[in-house]
Design a protein with these regions (language model features):
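Bulky hydrophobic segments
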Residues: 1-105, 111-127
Length: 127
């Protein structure tokens, strides 16, 4: 397995790629994002925010787990970092990105996603 990437190293790459994917999605011009009218009634946007940040937390904790770092030791600092990142993205949408508008409710959905991802990671990666 020396010539190919190990699961542990791939897990880090996946977490970083997801991080970049979320950044790109959040920086995309708002008028170029498809609008599905029927989804507006269930706040689909908030579910997406929650899911993106839950996935980011799970991927990051998986990387820690596969690289033999104790998940419980790092879960709170990583959660704090991701919550800060979610708030920063909303601020950047308000100030830097074209046709994007940051919303505090999106920041809340991001944060709840981190909490959900933390719960899932604890269930998956701790004994």
């Amino acid at each position: 397995m020396s010539k190919s990437l190990s699961k542990a190293k791939l897990s880090i790459i996946y977490a970083l790629l997801w991080f970049v994917f979320v950044f790109v999605l959040c920086s995309f011009p708002g008028n170029q994002i498809p609008n599905f009218e029927f989804l507006n009634h269930i706040s689909f946007d908030k579910i997406i925010h929650l899911g993106m940040f839950a996935m980011q937390m799970v991927l990051m904790q998986r990387a820690f787990y596969l690289n033999n770092f104790p998940v419980k030791l790092y879960i709170i600092p990583i959660a704090e970092l991701l919550i800060f990142w979610g708030m920063t993205l909303e601020y950047m949408q308000t100030t830097f990105f074209i046709n994007r508008f940051g919303e505090w409710i999106d920041a809340l959905a991001n944060s709840l996603g981190v909490v959900l991802g933390s719960y899932i990671a604890i269930k998956l990666y701790t004994k």
